[in-house]
A protein has these predicted regions:
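ABC-type ATPase nucleotide-binding domains, specifically the catalytic core motifs of the NBD
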Residues: 86, 90-106, 114
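Conserved ABC ATPase signature
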Residues: 124-132
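Non-catalytic connector elements of ABC transporters
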Residues: 2-34, 38-51, 55-56, 232-337
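Internal alpha/beta loop-helix hairpins
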Residues: 176-246
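ABC ATPase NBD coupling module
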Residues: 57-74, 98, 206, 210
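Conserved ABC ATPase "signature" region
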Residues: 58, 103-120
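Hydrophobic anchor residue at the start of the ABC signature
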Residues: 138
Length: 337
């Protein structure tokens, strides 16, 4: 879908519907739900195009706007995807009414088994915990043999996505705010911010090598420094990066030239902290601690200049009486873009 406007929300997104699980990740108001609703046909963009596979289902200029029922997209959103007065089995049988009785019964039994719901077939939706209810909703949706599955619910978990991968080979677009679950369960990651697609690609590749500052911020690379490439050493596989307050040794930057302006990023959990009197090493920066925030398992340390580190509570207990601090930005943990 590209360049769509829905009410006051503007979407400038070119997002391919490809087989496998694509996670849509971004802050509230980024356009994740609006994207799915436009694809499904529940909202009508003022302009733009929507394609499902090779089929154009919406084109504002050409006057094409297929109704939702003809797009063959299964959409699971805030509304319950199950009939509350029916059991799980009855819900699936209702969705499978295109087949003859014996074939329908067989297909429903197979789908219940795939989603590990055989013990819940006579239960009603209200009697299921949220995550199992969502499994039943997905199973019912797949009985209609959709071309694509759109999931806009926060109850999706690793078990559901694993079962879904074995039950459906087509495109899945899944809205989530769980970055760890994206990493473990999605094939691709689409990063949305302000109605724009700011990053897209295989999950691990995009998490390790974000394409922009906006993408880096979304995937929790909180330490970001504008820098100038002051040197390139292919023999040592290194670069020299001049930031505003310090100079860093980074990875060799193939395709870049000396003098190029870049951004350097590092996750807070990859920053190491040392006592001020320790002999400095590579990428050690003397820093002043300005804020400490205790969390359930970690402590977040924020230093003058904006660098933040996330360390274990045990490590902080050993170092809390430091008279001075040095932060270490390991070269292997730096991301340059």
């Amino acid at each position: 879908m590209t360049h769509a406007r829905i009410g006051n929300a503007r979407l400038e997104i070119d997002l391919p519907l490809v087989d496998g699980i694509t996670a849509l990740f971004g802050p509230a108001g980024a356009g994740k739900s609006a994207t799915l609703e436009a694809i499904a046909g529940f909202t009508r963009p003022e302009r733009g195009r929507v394609l499902i596979g090779d089929a154009i289902v919406f084109d504002a200029d050409a006057g094409v706007n297929l109704p939702a029922r003809r797009r063959r997209c299964a959409w699971l959103g805030a509304r319950d995807g199950l009939f509350p007065h029916m059991t799980v089995r009855q819900n699936l049988l209702f969705a499978a009414d295109r087949w003859a009785r014996l074939e329908r019964t067989k297909r429903v039994a197979e789908m219940l088994a795939r989603f590990e719901l055989a013990d819940a077939l006579e239960m009603r939706p209200r009697d299921l915990p949220p995550q199992r209810r969502l499994r039943a909703e997905v199973a019912r949706a797949l009985m209609t043999e959709p071309k694509a599955l759109l999931i806009d619910q926060q109850d999706a978990d690793e078990a559901l996505l694993r079962l879904l991968r074995g039950a459906f080979a087509g495109p899945v677009l899944w809205v989530t705010d769980d970055l760890d679950l994206c990493y473990s369960s999605a094939d691709r990651l689409a990063l949305l911010d302000g109605g724009r697609l700011v990053g897209y690609g295989p999950v691990r590749e995009l998490m390790e090598h974000p394409e922009s500052v906006e993408a880096a911020r979304l995937i929790a690379i909180s330490n970001l420094y504008p820098a100038t490439i002051a040197g390139l050493d292919p023999g040592r596989n290194q670069s020299r990066l001049e930031c505003a307050d310090f100079v860093l040794t980074g990875p060799y930057l193939k395709g870049h030239l000396k003098g190029d302006r870049v951004w350097v990023g590092i996750r807070a959990e990859d920053v190491r902290v040392h006592a001020g009197e320790m002999e400095p090493g590579v990428n050690f920066v003397a820093s002043q601690l300005v804020r400490m925030t205790e969390r359930s398992r970690t402590v977040r340390l924020e230093f003058a200049g904006g660098t933040a580190a996330e360390i274990s509570r045990e490590q902080y207990a050993r170092q809390k009486d430091n008279k001075g601090w040095q932060v270490e930005l390991p070269p292997a943990a730096l991301r340059v873009f």
